[in-house]
Amino acid sequence: MDFIKSLVENKLLLIGNFVLTSGKISPYYLDLRRLSNYYEIFSDTVNKAIDKIKNIDFDMIIGIATGGIPFASFISCRMGKPLGYIRMEKKGYGTDKILEADVSGRKILLVDDVATTGGSLSKAVEIINSEGGRVVASLVIVDREEGAEKKLGEYGVKLISVYKIREILEYLLNSSLISDNDKNNIKEYLVKNIE
């Protein structure tokens, strides 16, 4: 699969031991903040995402800083939808806003690069909803399948992903792109953590 090969070749999928935002230790890390550096694969990913959300009724896109902003921006431009973004913490200067958008009365598509447990996404949903918006769906490039779908479901928000981590890792496990030791670590992680 071109997407997965590109992730490995461009060091956007790293193998090792990584601490995630959720606090979990993972044998792989998706560094999708740089995916937009590779136009062809990024453009293809955006096209696939648009195909998955074309029947969702929303009127504004909110990207989560920082990983979700490039993805949200491309989708916004291609679909002709207004765009805003949300930080996970105040910046401490200027207007000190967390949400950079007027979401009142709007149906929101929330966008990020990766979903793991759903902590950041659910926090963003709460903030947007408290400002008068209504998150109708959340879109990510990769769902790590570690609870985000269930967590967002508690808010009535559907999680849509372009790729599931299971398909990415299964491809890697059946390839010569990573070592046998790394394959074993990933298999062990899959058994313990993937829904």
Swiss-Prot record:
Its EC number is 2.4.2.10. It is an enzyme of class 2 (transferase). GO terms for biological process: 'de novo' UMP biosynthetic process; pyrimidine nucleobase biosynthetic process. It catalyses: orotidine 5'-phosphate + diphosphate = orotate + 5-phospho-alpha-D-ribose 1-diphosphate. Gene3D superfamilies: 3.40.50.2020. It comes from the Archaea. Orotate binds at T116, R144. Its cofactor is Mg(2+). The keyword Transmembrane helix does not apply. The keyword Nucleotide-binding does not apply. GO terms for molecular function: magnesium ion binding; orotate phosphoribosyltransferase activity. 5-phospho-alpha-D-ribose 1-diphosphate binds at R87, K91, D112, D113, V114, A115, T116, T117, G118, G119, S120. Pathway: Pyrimidine metabolism; UMP biosynthesis via de novo pathway; UMP from orotate: step 1/2. Keywords: Glycosyltransferase, Magnesium, Pyrimidine biosynthesis, Transferase. Belongs to the purine/pyrimidine phosphoribosyltransferase family. PyrE subfamily. Homodimer. Catalyzes the transfer of a ribosyl phosphate group from 5-phosphoribose 1-diphosphate to orotate, leading to the formation of orotidine monophosphate (OMP). This is Orotate phosphoribosyltransferase.
